[in-house]
């Protein structure tokens, strides 16, 4: 369990979603919002990609350090930065190697019609799962060129035209 692993490795469990009780679904298997703070790059919850309502916060003193750990990570699904500095935000947007980027938002997931997906080890094959890429993934395109003249007589190597 990632929540137990994060806590045992020393991350500060700020919000624990393990004991959530949803009225009408008492026997369900749910995890509520979970937030870890003071996560370091040697922790399992940093190294592995966790899907679900689990957020890991890595606090760093220098912008370049943040860019390095993000861009050197094997996964690249989503990341966020909190700043009031527009120059840093633009630098982050331009240079971070991540598929979904948030500026002053906790989870950089827009509406479902946008392509979902990250870069590097976070991508689902060659396509995202939402938006135009998702439609193209589930669509098999075929191009058919056809001509049905009334009389076909002789041989012609000319491209047919509409006359």
Locate each region found by the language model.
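Conserved C-terminal structural/oligomerization subdomain of aldehyde/semialdehyde dehydrogenase
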Residues: 23-163
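Alpha-helical packing segments of well-folded alpha/beta enzyme cores
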Residues: 2-3
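Cytochrome P450 fold signature focused on the C-terminal beta-domain
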Residues: 13-23
